[in-house]
């Protein structure tokens, strides 16, 4: 399986990304602390962090751009988040980020939810699986 090949053949280098639309900085701090603690418990390597205190409706977010830049440059091959909603609650916005990860053979790891199930119930897993099959790539999520 392509997904297994990434995790077996290449050491995961994760970028921890937190996002909240709350105006309280403590929400982002708590979210990031949770991500880093989970990474430590699972012996995952975190190569960088970024965060956004904004809505997830747009891709024009500095923290998300930093995470994508790290993936694009090969500094990271995965993004660590609490749940898919941290990318976006909107289908098309989340799909664009996941397609970006797929195009760069990178994965998404969710610490608070089962990414595969969450993507399935949001209707995102099937188009990504079909895209992976047609392009010979990977599905952009990893089981915890």
Regions found by a protein language model. Name each.
Residues 1-144:
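Short, structured surface patches at the beginning of a domain
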């Amino acid at each position: 399986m392509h997904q297994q090949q990434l995790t077996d053949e290449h050491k995961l280098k994760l970028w921890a990304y937190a996002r909240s639309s709350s105006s309280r900085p403590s929400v982002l701090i708590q979210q990031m602390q949770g991500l880093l603690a989970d990474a430590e418990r699972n012996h995952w390597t975190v190569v960088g962090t970024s965060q956004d205190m904004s809505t997830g409706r747009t891709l024009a977010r500095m923290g998300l751009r930093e995470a994508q830049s790290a993936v694009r440059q090969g500094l990271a091959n995965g993004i660590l988040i609490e749940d898919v909603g941290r990318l976006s609650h909107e289908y098309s916005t989340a799909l664009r980020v996941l397609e970006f990860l797929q195009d760069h053979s990178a994965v998404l790891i969710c610490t608070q939810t089962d990414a595969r199930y969450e993507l399935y119930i949001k209707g995102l897993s099937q188009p990504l699986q079909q895209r992976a099959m047609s392009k010979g790539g990977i599905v952009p999520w990893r089981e915890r």
